[in-house]
Amino acid sequence: RQFDADRAALLTALPAGGVVGVLECATHSGDAVRVLELAHSAPYFHAAIGIHPESLIEEDAATVAVYHGDWRAELAAMRPLFADKAVAAVGEIGLDHHWPVPRQEQYDLFEAQLQLAKELDLPVSVHDREAHAEMYELLRKYKPRGALHCYSGSADDAAWLVEQGMYLGFGGAVTYKGAKRAAKVLAAIPHERALLET
């Protein structure tokens, strides 16, 4: 709501500023309708529909508030949304070991969504926080195409991910003086595989 006053003007101005596309990600079924509405508002907006691992414990997320933690039922209910032509990806999905989200539950959820992306031939928008080993295990198994946002892994892992066809997203923190690891990663991958994130 804090952006409501000038949102329309800002969104309309994006192409003039050189923006060629925007991918808005849902984090649970409760976000999906809003994300689809935005995706239908202009040809350069696209939707990603998925269940974020943190939605497994967020009380206001539909995963908890509506489905009482039954992500399988929620994912089944979301399935018809993927027929919408504005849906360009499955996301935001992934693993997050920073928060107290049951690890096996989020692993199973992520794997189910990777299977869905493969079945629908859609790319993925992936979240990976402090879960690199398990993340790479599933990426090796399913070999999705898409983007790993807010990349924080090593240069070697980045090279492997790019070889698999993934894009790597980097936020403003890469400009910090102490961001030496990010600088090494950016030097190790083709620039066209790096995405800037807000």
Where are the regions that the model predicts?
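Mid-domain alpha/beta scaffold segments of enzyme catalytic cores
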Residues: 1-198
